[in-house]
Regions:
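Outer-membrane beta-barrel translocator/pore domains, especially the C-terminal barrels
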Residues: 1-219
Length: 219
């Protein structure tokens, strides 16, 4: 899908730097102004069924595995045409910094983004269901039991990033025990990147640093 927004406002601002007071000066401006933003996203998914049949004479007659993989893509352009700069001069006059701002900062509908982003999302949802021979010998139908109500994995790849492009893999799941009287949920975050000696994430895969494929960062 593609989204386009036209934003109109009658209140904008101008920013300058006062060297005497060494402070930012914000001047409100009245009058019609506008900016436009747009983005694009798309996704596709499917459902895959797997059946393992053990025979009607077995206690567990069959197990069905349902997988729902999906992939998505999002892109948000940088609208830096709506940004300006002002100079901040140090007290000794030796250094000058450029500060970016947009005149739409105080707009009722927010301001246009300045950072380009592009990412691919991956997810996989699973559930496992078993057909079990009923203890009641008079029953004609097998009993259906969920072994796993859900087992989900998701991650993102930052196409626009210059490092640490993969986000951590988020794992979540749940099942029910004791004839659906007890619900059990679990989750974990698995990071593909290694840590340095200061426990700071670095742009090196954990497996290339002598570790496992993923590093458990939370559970």
């Amino acid at each position: 899908s593609a989204n386009y927004k036209e934003n109109w406002t009658f209140n904008t601002i101008n920013k300058t730097y006062d060297t005497e007071t060494e402070s930012e000066v914000v001047t409100p401006l009245k009058g019609f102004d506008s900016y436009r933003t747009y983005n694009f996203s798309t996704s596709v998914g499917t459902t895959v069924y797997g059946m393992f049949d053990f025979g009607e004479d077995k206690k567990i007659q069959a197990i069905r595995h349902v997988m729902r993989p999906s992939i998505s893509y999002n892109i948000n352009p940088a609208f830096d045409q709506y940004y300006e700069t002002y100079e901040v001069i140090s007290a000794d006059g030796m250094t000058t910094d450029q500060v970016d701002y947009t005149r739409f900062e105080n707009s009722l509908f927010g301001s246009p983004g300045k950072v380009f982003s592009s990412s691919v999302g991956l997810s996989l949802n699973n559930n496992l269901e078993a057909k079990i021979r009923d203890k009641d010998s008079t029953a004609t139908e097998a009993k259906k039991v969920f072994l796993l109500n859900s087992l989900n994995f998701s991650t993102n790849y930052n196409v626009a990033g210059d490092s640490l492009n993969w986000s951590p893999v988020r794992l979540s799941g749940g099942t029910q025990l004791l004839d659906n009287k007890l619900s059990v949920n679990f989750g974990a975050t698995l990071d593909p990147y290694a840590l340095d000696n200061n426990n700071t994430k670095v742009n090196t895969f954990n497996i290339d640093n002598g570790g496992s494929l993923f590093r458990l960062s939370s559970a």
